[in-house]
């Protein structure tokens, strides 16, 4: 079992290198601005003592006023984990793709795109993975029905 890192402590490290990247944090997670996602992800992956080299999973959540993309990260070397979140508007739901950093994000980003309609900018093959091409809408959205 991995040791979860305190979100507030990691947020301080992020802010020390990437000012204005952190939107909110607590003991369990860090929410960052979408424009900073790639820079923060690379920082978390390459910084000594953090080295989050493994992306466990990505999920999407449809809240009343926004979408949230949640990244569950693990450092195999240090046996610790972190929950990283990014929020985007429902009117223009898009965040940068992290496939260039964690190849395992490929199908997970496609799933979130297919079922929630969040666009992952820079994804090398962003197309539906469960629903057929031409399917109208995104079935896990609150407003689907």
Task: Please provide the spans of the model-predicted regions.
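Terminal low-complexity/charged segments
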Residues: 1-145
């Amino acid at each position: 079992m991995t040791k979860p890192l305190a979100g507030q402590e990691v947020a301080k490290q992020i802010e020390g290198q990437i000012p204005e990247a952190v939107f909110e944090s607590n003991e369990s997670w860090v929410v960052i601005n979408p424009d900073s996602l790639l820079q923060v992800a690379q920082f978390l992956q390459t910084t000594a003592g953090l080295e989050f080299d493994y992306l466990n999973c990505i999920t999407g959540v449809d809240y009343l006023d926004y979408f949230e993309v949640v990244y569950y990260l693990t450092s195999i070397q240090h046996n610790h984990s972190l929950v990283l979140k990014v929020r985007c508007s429902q009117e223009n739901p898009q965040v940068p793709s992290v496939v260039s950093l964690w190849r395992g994000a490929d199908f997970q980003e496609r799933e979130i795109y297919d079922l929630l309609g969040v666009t992952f900018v820079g994804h090398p093959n962003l197309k539906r993975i469960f629903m057929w091409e031409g399917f109208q809408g995104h079935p896990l959205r609150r407003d689907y029905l």
